[in-house]
């Protein structure tokens, strides 16, 4: 059976592994998923990301991050733009997540970036997800 929303599946795998306090999670790789994982790493939401070649599309392995007492670094993940209802924003309407405590991942003409970068470059695009 084909998957209708691979990005939502990727975010759900991360959310579920995070709730179960798993050390890492694997998902089929794609360019968009790699870009999202790199942003999560840069912003400090995950510990590391690794790409495994399997002579097909590859596998992306995300290593989750927890605090000193085992508290989760990722409090929540939410898919915004879905295949049935795309969500686009103009450069002057880029959203803030929890008043700047979280990030919005936006797919722009300059690639996949955070809301802060999109605001700085004055570009809009498709709002992929919110992470806080």
From Swiss-Prot:
Report keywords, A-Z: Ribonucleoprotein, Ribosomal protein, RNA-binding, rRNA-binding
Q: Could you name the domain of life of the organism this protein comes from?
A: Bacteria
Q: Which InterPro entries does the record match to this protein? A: Ribosomal_uS8, Ribosomal_uS8_CS, Ribosomal_uS8_sf
Q: Which Pfam families match?
A: Ribosomal_S8
Q: Which GO terms describe its molecular function?
A: rRNA binding; structural constituent of ribosome
Q: Name one GO biological process term.
A: translation
Quote the cellular component terms of the Gene Ontology held in the record: ribonucleoprotein complex; ribosome
Summarizing the function annotation, the protein's role is: One of the primary rRNA binding proteins, it binds directly to 16S rRNA central domain where it helps coordinate assembly of the platform of the 30S subunit.
Tell me which family the UniProt entry assigns to this protein. Belongs to the universal ribosomal protein uS8 family.
Subunit structure as annotated in this protein's UniProt entry: Part of the 30S ribosomal subunit. Contacts proteins S5 and S12.
PANTHER family from the UniProt entry: 40S RIBOSOMAL PROTEIN S15A
Question: What is the protein's given name?
Answer: Small ribosomal subunit protein uS8
What is the species listed in this Swiss-Prot or TrEMBL entry?
Limosilactobacillus fermentum (strain NBRC 3956 / LMG 18251) (Lactobacillus fermentum)
């Amino acid at each position: 059976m084909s998957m209708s929303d691979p990005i939502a599946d990727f975010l759900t795998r991360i959310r579920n592994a995070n709730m179960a306090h798993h050390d890492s999670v694997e998902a089929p790789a794609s360019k968009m998923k790699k870009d999202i994982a790199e942003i999560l790493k840069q912003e400090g939401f995950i510990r590391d990301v690794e790409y495994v070649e399997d002579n097909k599309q590859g596998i992306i392995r995300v290593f989750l991050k927890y605090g000193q007492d085992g508290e989760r670094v990722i409090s929540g993940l939410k898919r915004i733009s879905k295949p049935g209802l795309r969500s686009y924003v103009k450069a002057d309407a880029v959203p803030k997540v929890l008043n700047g405590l979280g990030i919005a991942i936006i797919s722009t003409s300059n690639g996949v970036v955070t809301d802060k970068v999109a605001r700085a470059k004055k570009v809009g695009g498709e709002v992929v997800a919110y992470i806080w």
